[in-house]
């Protein structure tokens, strides 16, 4: 981190706890570090160098966890810690992100399992369990977390006859945790992970001051990908016009790639079925995998794309231009480590495990990576140019995550926006097409420190100072 990523202020550590499945998201013990990774002293040492984001997988635990084992043995303090099957509970409308059974029988007890038979949902209805979860949250802060990512938080509260998704009680739990953190650790931020349509996603801002400090900008990855595949920025531009500043204490968590796939649900109301199908076709062509959902009429629709973002786009030039969009956008940008290091699809991992998401979860060997950053032209180009962009952005106050943003319309081959904070102003322009574009605009490009005369080469990007 110190050697190769000096310009990152924060690091998101994916689940670092003992686990039994789902690459870490089936946690056995919230408060132990997986010995394969080190121990708490390693985490605390890293927290001295960078701000850290911890994952709080509060919706579910591994069936091998001590808490669940105590539930199975009917320990008095854990008898309601998880959700048992109740024939009077109407779960017919429950939102399902998986095709696996909603209830799983484990040692004679049928329990709620949203994501898999190994991941048992916690019962936030139980005051004792909610108190335990709250203690975990506060322990993470004590251990050095600067941000807490609430994984799958939208599923937390279950209620008969509802979707058991985004329920008011879930929002109340987040408000409780936000109040505690604002009082006890005001510099710690809550980030909600809800990969759902945009209106539902931004509901986790609450009033802008009482729930999430940041929400994931889930429409951004598929919309940017669509722009480069089609050579047309219209959908991205029109959606971006709806994104406004939230408050002085809340903003967007922007990203293009992550350990998960690229979700298409967030753009169901933004892109047409045909446009989403076209993205899926391009992903398949570029070696990726597509997960489909069944529709009521018997048809299928793509809902998640499993592919490395560089492989999806096809070239280093497109990846760099895409990240110029990411780094310009209102909010806090987050770059997946495989993106800055120029990784491509890990087909071997998919073939060996049969798990589609492994295509973008390659575990890199440090010495091999360091050698390739020098000897592999694509890795070297991406790493050096993205690192340069980060250095420039770091010193530009107009990119303040709580500043203003105005989307500009320079035609469908370009995505452009104006960023403003205080007296600092700049215009970011990205050519998302394979054509030369000429604009009636000139000024100093702060990336290259040269005068931009109005001509953009294919996939070229500029940040024009207006000061």
Which role does the model predict for each range below?
Residues 442-451:
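Solvent-exposed beta-hairpin/edge-strand motifs
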Residues 1-440, 454-467:
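Active-site and adjacent substrate-binding regions of carbohydrate-active enzymes
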């Amino acid at each position: 981190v110190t050697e190769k990523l000096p310009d990152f202020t924060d690091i998101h550590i994916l689940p670092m706890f003992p686990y039994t499945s789902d690459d870490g998201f089936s946690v056995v013990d919230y408060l132990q570090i997986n010995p394969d990774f080190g121990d708490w002293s390693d985490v605390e040492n890293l927290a001295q160098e960078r701000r850290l984001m911890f994952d709080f997988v509060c919706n579910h635990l591994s069936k091998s966890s001590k808490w669940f084992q105590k539930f199975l043995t009917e320990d008095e303090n854990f008898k309601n810690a998880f959700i048992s099957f109740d024939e009077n509970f109407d779960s017919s409308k429950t939102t399902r992100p998986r095709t696996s059974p909603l209830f799983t029988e484990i040692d004679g007890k049928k329990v709620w399992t949203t994501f898999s038979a190994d991941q048992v949902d916690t019962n936030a209805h139980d005051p004792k369990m909610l108190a335990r979860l709250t203690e975990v949250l506060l322990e993470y802060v004590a251990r050095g977390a600067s941000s807490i990512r609430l994984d799958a938080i939208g599923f937390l509260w279950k209620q008969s006859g509802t979707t058991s998704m985004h329920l008011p009680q879930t929002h109340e739990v987040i408000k409780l945790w936000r109040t505690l953190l604002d009082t006890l650790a005001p510099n710690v931020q809550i980030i909600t992970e809800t990969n759902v349509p945009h209106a539902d996603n931004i509901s986790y801002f609450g009033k802008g001051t009482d729930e999430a400090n940041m929400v994931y900008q889930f429409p951004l990855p598929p919309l940017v990908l669509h722009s480069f595949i089609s050579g047309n920025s219209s959908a991205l531009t029109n959606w971006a016009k709806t994104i406004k500043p939230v408050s002085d204490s809340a903003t967007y968590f922007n990203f293009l790639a992550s350990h998960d796939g690229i979700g298409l649900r967030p753009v169901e109301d933004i892109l047409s079925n045909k446009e989403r199908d076209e993205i899926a076709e391009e992903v398949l062509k570029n070696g990726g995998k597509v997960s489909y959902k069944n529709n009521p009429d018997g048809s299928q629709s793509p809902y998640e794309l499993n592919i490395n973002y560089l492989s999806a786009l096809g070239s280093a030039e497109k990846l760099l231009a895409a990240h110029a969009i990411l780094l310009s956008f209102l909010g806090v940008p987050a770059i997946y480590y495989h993106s800055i290091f120029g990784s491509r699809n890990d087909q071997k991992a998919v073939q060996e495990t049969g798990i589609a998401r492994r295509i973008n979860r390659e575990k890199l060997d440090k010495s091999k990576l360091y050698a390739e950053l020098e000897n592999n032209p694509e890795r070297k180009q991406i790493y050096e140019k993205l690192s340069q962009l980060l250095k420039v952005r770091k010193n530009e106050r107009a990119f303040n995550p709580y500043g203003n943003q105005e989307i500009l319309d320079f035609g469908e081959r370009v995505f452009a926006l104006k960023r403003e904070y205080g007296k600092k102003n700049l215009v970011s322009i990205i050519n998302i097409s394979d054509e030369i574009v000429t604009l009636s605009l000139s000024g100093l490009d702060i990336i290259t420190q040269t005068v931009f005369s109005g001509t953009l080469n294919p996939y070229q990007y500029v940040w024009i100072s207006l000061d």
